[in-house]
Amino acid sequence: MKDVTDENRQNSENAIKTYVSVAFKIAASAIFAALVAAATLLFVIPIPATSGYFNFGETLIYIAALLFGPLVGAIAGAGASIADALVAIQYAPGTFTIKAIEGFLVGFLFKKIKAKTKSITLSATVAVVVGGLEMVAGYFLYETLILGYPFALAALEVPFNIVQMLIGLVVAVPVMHAVLRVFPQLKSQF
């Protein structure tokens, strides 16, 4: 009888942990989507040729994806479209898709590479670079195929997007390490 009671208690504790984990991820998704939108709006360097802009929301997408995984990363990425809906509406649909895919890719690749290499820094770096390159290619294709910008005009934004990715990488990886030192329990996410 005692074994059944212990098993029931363990099942209840696991159910509570799962519920808390799901609730925590939902909250983290909402918070990061809002933070990405705010960072995208507050720290802006316009690119007049394309009506696009350089911003620091990228960094928060990477942090969300690295710490909480692909789904939180995707939702955080989609948060950037909130900013575009306010300041560059023509980019909002593309941003929703491009940044959501970017956040998902970073979180997904980080988990997969980390499982094989055991190196958090290498895994994070590769994941961010691949996700960032998806963002660069995604905006280039969106501007040429959807917005109808000439190839040369869309190409003007490529270096800005690469710098945005690199700044995000240089900031996000150390921040991830710092957060994991303070909250080591987050390592269970990956």
Go through each PLM region and give its residues.
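Loop-helix junctions at membrane interfaces
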Residues: 1-190
